[in-house]
Amino acid sequence: MGEISITKLLVVAALVVLLFGTKKLRTLGGDLGAAIKGFKKAMNDDDAAAKKSAEDTVPAEKLSHKE
């Protein structure tokens, strides 16, 4: 009873297509894809900025202990 079968998935998919229509689903898919692409680009830009910032830092001067 609690199992998800292929027939149940097909019925749900058919209902979604009937409710929203193919054009709306296509638009929604495109918007979702663009959002994921933008998120990945922002993550890569942030990583590149952090790496550049780490490369720009001056290493600390090593001090020797004098007795």
Curated annotation (Swiss-Prot):
Subcellular location: Cell inner membrane
Keyword Metal-binding applies: no
Keywords: Cell inner membrane, Cell membrane, Membrane, Protein transport, Translocation, Transmembrane, Transmembrane helix, Transport
Membrane topology designation: Single-pass membrane protein
InterPro entries: TatA/B/E, TatA/E, TatE
Family statement: Belongs to the TatA/E family. TatE subfamily.
Its job: Part of the twin-arginine translocation (Tat) system that transports large folded proteins containing a characteristic twin-arginine motif in their signal peptide across membranes. TatE shares overlapping functions with TatA.
NCBIfam families (alphabetical): PRK01614.1, PRK03625.1, tatAE
Protein name listed in UniProt: Probable Sec-independent protein translocase protein TatE
Phylogenetic lineage: Bacteria, Pseudomonadati, Pseudomonadota, Gammaproteobacteria, Enterobacterales
Gene transcribed to yield this protein: tatE
